[in-house]
């Protein structure tokens, strides 16, 4: 029967078929041709397998090892290749080669993701989205490892494993547990700002193309004269912001759980390349020292009025991965991967991630993960004293000396890439930061950014989640949101009361139904026992 051409993701196999003039010869992993891959080697047609069936053993042994550890966060994602092009000059702030000339293009790969879900989870969950960019620059790979929100839930990395545990499954029931999540949120009021964004309209983006990205952290830019400023990175979508209503997101989770991945793939295959603008905010060291709050606190944003956005360039995604596992799954990002001209700030969360991200890549992919094609700095080959280890994929740096310094033409230092000097002082202690202002910016979000309908949807979304929690957790959450604004707390209390009443009614109806079933159950059991008894009498003959 004649068929119309399907969507791009439906035509992948047909595209591959058309790209080949003839099939390859089927081989084992060591490249030997295979005579028959449709039957195992056995003694007779019904006999046992032979241990010398190396074709089967080769296939099965590799299959047993196909899966690698999934990311502990950001497990589910999609991505694509593209380029970054400089459109505006920022060399007065930054000497990085990637920004050196207007019109300069740098290859990139972006991986988008959800945060808390597993590899098979739905793309349309209410969850922050990862927005990680790898720039393959001529001075090494630069990873801008961001999210789709300008802030984060916590400001001290000591809480990160605990926070993520609340987003994962209960260790006993293996179910998502709202009590865990809201217990943590309500005990740590610094989460309030991000929680309001998460449960607002932007908590469920309409795919990956219609959301912004943010470096979130404060970084440091250094120019060729050694002068430094603090910086925040913004990636603004040119497609316009679009979000999904909760009911649509829930429907898609069942009908099209890979909605965002499919949308990105089909868009690029159709030539509808998504575009973003890379922008920065800049703050001087003097401004940072005298600012009204800690500018390195990732739970807060910098005022756009005081620190306006500066355009840097555009980002375009124009090529889908040739293999999902090799590229999207094996790509490894780390905020510690920076290039000359881009440095770190005292941001505590950033400092914590400098260790955590490379460490988790070592766990997932091994010590030589940077040698994988998707991760290697192919425009600036690595020369160092690191050798050997599992999966040393390239030439292992040949005969170059494995120590430094040396007298035998080994790799040498480059004197013009010295990091900027900066001063720190203070007592060594564990500063808990509980006295930070956790509610002023959430109040601005409530009063100045959200309109009346957005505030109403925020309240309903929070109530819909909180209704599953213990009463004392609900009360503590209401208290936090009341500190944002009295109207917020009052509205949430009213919405939660209605949600609780509806929940109680539903549970009473379920209990009544279960009680009726339990009354009928003994009769059914008696009937089955009589049948078994009669069957036993029959079988004895």
Curated annotation (Swiss-Prot):
Gene Ontology molecular functions: catalase activity; heme binding; metal ion binding
Region (Disordered): 1-20
Major location (coarse): other
Catalytic residue positions: 74, 147
A GO biological-process term: hydrogen peroxide catabolic process
TM annotation in the entry: none
Record's keyword terms, sorted: Heme, Hydrogen peroxide, Iron, Metal-binding, Oxidoreductase, Peroxidase, Peroxisome
Iron is among the record's keywords: yes
InterPro entries membership: Catalase (IPR018028), Catalase_3 (IPR040333), Catalase_AS (IPR024708), Catalase_clade1/3 (IPR024711), Catalase_core (IPR011614), Catalase_haem_BS (IPR002226), Catalase_immune_responsive (IPR010582), Catalase_sf (IPR020835)
Localisation: Peroxisome matrix
Co-factor(s): heme
Reaction equation(s) it catalyzes: 2 H2O2 = O2 + 2 H2O
GO cellular component: mitochondrion; peroxisomal matrix
Annotated positions binding heme: 357
EC id: 1.11.1.6
Role: Catalyzes the degradation of hydrogen peroxide (H(2)O(2)) generated by peroxisomal oxidases to water and oxygen, thereby protecting cells from the toxic effects of hydrogen peroxide.
Family: Belongs to the catalase family.
The protein, known as: Catalase
């Amino acid at each position: 029967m004649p068929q119309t051409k399907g969507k791009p993701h439906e035509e992948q196999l047909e595209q591959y078929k058309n790209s080949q003039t003839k099939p390859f010869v089927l081989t084992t992993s060591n490249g030997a041709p295979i005579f028959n891959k449709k039957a195992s080697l056995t003694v007779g047609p019904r006999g046992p397998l032979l241990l010398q069936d190396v074709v089967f053993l080769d296939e099965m042994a590799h299959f047993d090892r196909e899966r690698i550890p999934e990311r502990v966060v950001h497990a589910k994602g999609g991505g694509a290749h593209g380029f970054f092009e400089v459109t505006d000059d920022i060399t007065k702030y930054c000497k990085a080669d990637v920004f050196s000339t207007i019109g300069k293009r740098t290859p990139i790969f972006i991986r988008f993701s959800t945060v808390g879900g597993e590899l098979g989870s739905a793309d349309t969950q209410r969850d922050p989205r990862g927005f990680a960019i790898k720039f393959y620059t001529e001075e090494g790979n630069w990873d801008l490892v961001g999210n789709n929100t300008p802030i984060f839930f916590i400001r001290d990395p000591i809480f990160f494993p605990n926070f993520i545990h609340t987003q994962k499954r209960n260790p006993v029931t293996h179910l998502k547990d709202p009590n865990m999540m809201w217990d943590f949120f309500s005990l740590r009021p610094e989460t309030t700002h991000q929680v309001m964004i998460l449960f607002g309209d932007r908590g469920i983006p309409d795919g990956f193309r219609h959301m912004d990205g943010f470096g979130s952290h404060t970084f440091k830019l250094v120019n060729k004269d050694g002068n430094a400023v603090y910086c925040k990175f913004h990636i603004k979508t040119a497609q316009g912001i679009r979000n999904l209503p909760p009911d649509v997101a829930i429907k898609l989770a069942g009908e099209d759980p890979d909605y965002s991945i499919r949308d990105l793939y089909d868009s690029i295959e159709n030539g509808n390349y998504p575009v973003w603008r890379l922008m920065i905010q800049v703050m001087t060291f003097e401004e940072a020292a005298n600012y009204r709050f800690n500018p390195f606190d990732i739970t807060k944003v910098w005022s756009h009025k005081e620190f306006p956005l500066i355009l840097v360039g555009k980002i375009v995604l124009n090529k889908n991965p040739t293999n999902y596992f090799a590229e999207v799954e094996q790509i490894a990002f780390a905020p510690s991967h920076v290039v000359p001209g881009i440095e770190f700030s005292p941001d505590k969360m950033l400092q914590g991630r400098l260790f955590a991200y490379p460490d988790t890549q070592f766990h997932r992919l091994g010590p030589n993960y940077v040698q994988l094609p998707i991760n290697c700095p192919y425009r600036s080959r690595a020369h160092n004293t690191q050798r050997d280890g599992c999966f040393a994929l390239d030439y292992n740096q040949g005969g170059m000396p494995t120590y430094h310094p040396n007298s035998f033409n080994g790799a040498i230092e480059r004197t013009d890439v010295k990091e900027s000097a900066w001063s720190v002082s203070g007592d060594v202690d564990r500063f808990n930061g509980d006295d930070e202002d956790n509610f002023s910016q959430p109040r601005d979000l409530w009063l100045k950014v959200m309109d009346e309908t957005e505030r109403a949807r925020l309240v309903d979304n929070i109530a819909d989640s909180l209704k599953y929690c213990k009463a004392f957790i609900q009360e503590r959450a209401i208290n936090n949101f009341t500190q944002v604004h009295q109207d917020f707390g009052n509205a949430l209390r009213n919405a939660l009361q209605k949600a609780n009443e509806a929940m109680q009614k539903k549970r009473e109806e379920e209990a009544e139904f279960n009680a009726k079933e339990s009354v009928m159950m003994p009769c059914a059991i008696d009937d089955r026992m009589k049948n078994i008894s009669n069957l036993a009498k029959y079988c004895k003959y």
